[in-house]
């Protein structure tokens, strides 16, 4: 149980560092578009990555340690690029998020008498207008996960590397704990953002979110640089 909890805490600490994947989950939650598909992609990707990390950390470290250095520098470039994009969006100060809301009948007094007429609340614009609105967010989640060098660093260096010290059985318990953190985190963030979509869709709020993301990503990039 102690090994499981240790993996859970490490997984949570990695998730708390807001990266491009988490930003996508938040944005799609606010838009209420394809959030379930995005969450499923994130969870399935973590299963595969954590499994690969647990299986392959020793092999990579022993046979091709330069691969980890390449991943580290690619990760630095990736983080800094997204930090610049977030800072740019914050400076533009015009980020607006459109979310979906179903129209509801509203009773209103009729001007001609005591009757009641039915008005429709304005329907907020739906960005896609197709039933397959989840496809693009799902593809974005795949790209931001599998083309993110830091995902491999997390899997091989942190999950695989730290878990290896617990032995053959313990490392899988450790990886299960790390995945449990993902299992809680992504639905909580995605559906939580959907529940708070109205206040979070404000341009002022997103300006500060983008500033925070830029600062955090820059800090993570500096941390990776210092690891060398």
UniProtKB/Swiss-Prot annotation:
Protein name: Lysine exporter LysE
Function text: Catalyzes the efflux of L-lysine.
Name of the coding gene: lysE
Native organism: Corynebacterium efficiens (strain DSM 44549 / YS-314 / AJ 12310 / JCM 11189 / NBRC 100395)
Main location: membrane
Topology of the protein relative to the lipid bilayer: Multi-pass membrane protein
Subcellular location: Cell inner membrane
Keyword hit for Transmembrane helix: yes
Membrane-traversing stretches: 3-23, 37-57, 66-86, 139-159, 172-192, 208-228
Entry's family note: Belongs to the LysE/ArgO transporter (TC 2.A.75) family.
Gene Ontology terms: cellular component: plasma membrane
GO molecular function: amino acid transmembrane transporter activity
Domain of life: Bacteria
Keywords linked to the UniProt accession: Amino-acid transport, Cell inner membrane, Cell membrane, Membrane, Transmembrane, Transmembrane helix, Transport
